[in-house]
Amino acid sequence: TIINVKCTSPKQCLKPCKDLYGPHAGAKCMNGKCKCYNN
């Protein structure tokens, strides 16, 4: 799921993704936006 959070690295996405999807959520930075996924 792409969320509306700007990023330059996946680390910036980890907290917002975990806040939204819980502690097991993963995060990537794609095209300057965060992408969250559940494992």
Swiss-Prot record:
Return the annotated site residues (Aromatic residue of the functional dyad): 37
GO MF terms held by the record = ion channel inhibitor activity; potassium channel regulator activity; toxin activity
Quote the tissue specificity entry: Expressed by the venom gland.
Q: What else is known?
A: Negative results: does not inhibit calcium-activated potassium channels (KCa3.1/KCNN4) of human T-lymphocytes. Does not inhibit voltage-gated Shaker potassium channels. Does not inhibit Kv2.1/KCNB1 potassium channels.
Keyword set includes Disulfide bond:
yes
Residues modified as Asparagine amide are 39
Question: Which InterPro entries does its entry note?
Answer: Scorpion_toxin-like_sf (IPR036574), Scorpion_toxinS_K_inh (IPR001947)
Question: Site annotation (Basic residue of the functional dyad): which residues?
Answer: 28
The answer, when asked if Membrane is one of the entry's keywords, is no
Write down the superkingdom of origin. Answer: Eukaryota
Major site of localization recorded for this protein? secreted
What keywords does the record list, in alphabetical order? Amidation, Disulfide bond, Ion channel impairing toxin, Neurotoxin, Potassium channel impairing toxin, Secreted, Toxin, Voltage-gated potassium channel impairing toxin
Family indicated by similarity: Belongs to the short scorpion toxin superfamily. Potassium channel inhibitor family. Alpha-KTx 02 subfamily.
Q: Lineage of the source organism?
A: Eukaryota, Metazoa, Ecdysozoa, Arthropoda, Chelicerata
**Function per UniProt:** Blocks Kv1.3/KCNA3 voltage-gated potassium channels of human T-lymphocytes (Kd=0.25 nM).
Q: Give me the Gene Ontology terms describing cellular component.
A: extracellular region
Short name of one Pfam family for this protein? Answer: Toxin_2
Q: Where in the cell is it found?
A: Secreted
Listed name of the protein: Potassium channel toxin alpha-KTx 2.9
Which Cys-Cys disulfides exist here? 7-29, 13-34, 17-36
- Note what the entry says on domains: Has the structural arrangement of an alpha-helix connected to a beta-sheet by disulfide bonds (CSalpha/beta).
Family matches, as PROSITE patterns: SCORP_SHORT_TOXIN
